[in-house]
Regions:
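Basic/polar N-terminal segments that are highly enriched at the extreme N-terminus
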Residues: 244-246
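Carbohydrate-binding surfaces of carbohydrate-active enzymes
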Residues: 1-209, 215-224, 233-238
Length: 246
């Protein structure tokens, strides 16, 4: 992967080899048609709809976890999302006993229970403070930073990963099931499809989702789509790495 060129924002999305980066999936997540989000300024929880039709009977589940995955807060809210709307659902209360680094998980379900939107945040009890006195024409420096050093203390986890691949015309689609059987968070898990065991990564590739964080016991299914010709005679092999993945 090459260093970011200017403008840096574009190169946070994908690199010269069309390898999608974490920023790509963050942007993709934010453009969900129904999207729950957290307001950093006032700790509010919002629901955004980009649909042109009303969505009724939604359920939003909000949970806060300490670094050790102790659940510190949970709340369920029923909501309707009018077409092309933004609505504040509620404001998080002050939660006692939070670890310096903690996590916020948002899950939005439709009336059938299907997950239609989600979001996951790692947050700090120490707020970032901007140094407004040193603002210039292109930036404002940070005086003090949020504290995420505790992320380095996350226990190592071993994931269960399985895959199957199907051919559709000139494309191959690899279906990946990834599960976190541990009692710890699997943080920022990156999946890649390689040309055989320890082979080169297949690029370009379109992942349904990636750079995933899995709560204890959580299982996810995602797909990767790429040109079948990229495989040659090799068998596709999925590899999972991550912040604290063995």
């Amino acid at each position: 992967q090459i260093n970011n060129a200017w403008p840096s924002m574009i190169w946070h999305l994908y690199d010269f080899y069309l390898r999608p980066a974490g920023g790509y999936f963050g942007a993709k997540r934010s453009m969900e048609a129904l999207h729950p989000l957290y307001g950093y300024d006032d700790h509010s929880i919002w629901l955004v709809s980009s649909h042109y039709e009303d969505a009724k009977g939604l359920k939003l589940t909000t949970k806060i976890y300490n670094l050790d995955m102790t659940e510190k807060f949970t709340q369920e809210n029923s909501a309707d999302a009018p077409a092309d709307s933004t609505a504040k659902i509620f404001t998080l209360p002050d939660v006692a006993g939070l670890s310096p680094t903690y996590f916020l998980a948002l899950k939005l379900q439709d009336s059938t229970g299907k997950v239609v939107g989600s979001n996951f945040y790692w947050l700090s009890t120490k707020q970032e403070v901007l140094d407004w006195a040193k603002t210039n024409w292109w930036m404002t420096p940070t005086a003090t930073y949020a504290d995420f050093t505790a992320l380095s203390q996350l226990p190592k986890v071993k994931l269960n990963v399985s895959e199957r691949t199907e051919r559709k015309g000139e494309e191959s689609i690899t279906h990946v099931t990834i599960e976190n059987p541990s009692k710890s968070l699997a943080f920022f898990v990156r999946l890649k499809v390689a040309k055989g065991a320890k082979g080169e990564e297949i690029l370009p590739v379109i992942w349904e989702d990636n750079y995933i964080s899995l709560l204890p016991g959580e299982k996810r299914e995602v797909t990767a789509t790429y040109r079948a010709a990229e495989l040659g005679t090799a068998k596709p092999v999925v590899e999972a790495t991550g912040w604290n993945v063995e």
